[in-house]
């Protein structure tokens, strides 16, 4: 059996995938620690434990160059495109929103990379932004869908993390319900993301990946602003790691 491991060392989370003859058989997910290399090592040891042969290891993400035992290192753009096509073969565009960056990837009919945009200069519109506002209002990102269900969003004027946090506090003091503020934040983020995607004139189907893709409220609001379907997948957060594992699988097959 041919084994390939892909590890995506992100700024917020470290994700790992084991492919066995092209099938996902193991997953690994932990928050990225102060020393990302320790999470990469843990992922490698956990995913390969008990295997009869040593897997091919491909690293991607911010921390991909922090260890010296990988067989290959690949940029996250290539990996996210491949991972998206693995999860949803018809995908023509990927919107990935992680902890501290967001990216849009445009693919052709064959799944090849056409173009991409990346925003890693500002926390607005990222998982970190959503996390800060959620914590300010006494909840967590994991609870957003249930809290904001059937809630009318309150207008949010600032998308700067610092100013938006102050605005959320002011609105709460003025008596605005926290769930309405949170729905407003999600709506503002979705609108910003839609404008970002529109810069590439992307075609459907679109796959939404990254940690924020778990928020179905965000996905539905993004659909509304884009006026086209936005798909999600239970393994969407692992797209980068999946793509890395696919690359490793291809390299091993050619040998």
Swiss-Prot record:
Q: Which Gene3D superfamilies match?
A: 3.30.420.40
Cofactor(s) this protein cannot do without: [4Fe-4S] cluster
**The keyword Iron-sulfur belongs to this UniProt entry's keyword annotation:** yes
- Any binding details for the cofactor? Binds 1 [4Fe-4S] cluster per dimer.
Is Metal-binding given among the entry's keywords?
Answer: yes
Pfam families tied to this protein: BcrAD_BadFG (PF01869)
Q: Name one GO molecular function term.
A: 4 iron, 4 sulfur cluster binding
Could you name the domain of life of the organism this protein comes from?
A: Bacteria
Residues the entry annotates as binding [4Fe-4S] cluster: 122, 160
Arranged from A to Z, the UniProt key words for this protein are:
4Fe-4S, Iron, Iron-sulfur, Metal-binding
NCBIfam families to which the protein is assigned, alphabetical: CoA_E_activ
Kindly state the subunit structure of this protein: Homodimer.
This chain belongs to the protein called: Uncharacterized protein YjiL
Organism encoding this protein: Escherichia coli (strain K12)
User: Lineage in the entry?
Assistant: Bacteria, Pseudomonadati, Pseudomonadota, Gammaproteobacteria, Enterobacterales
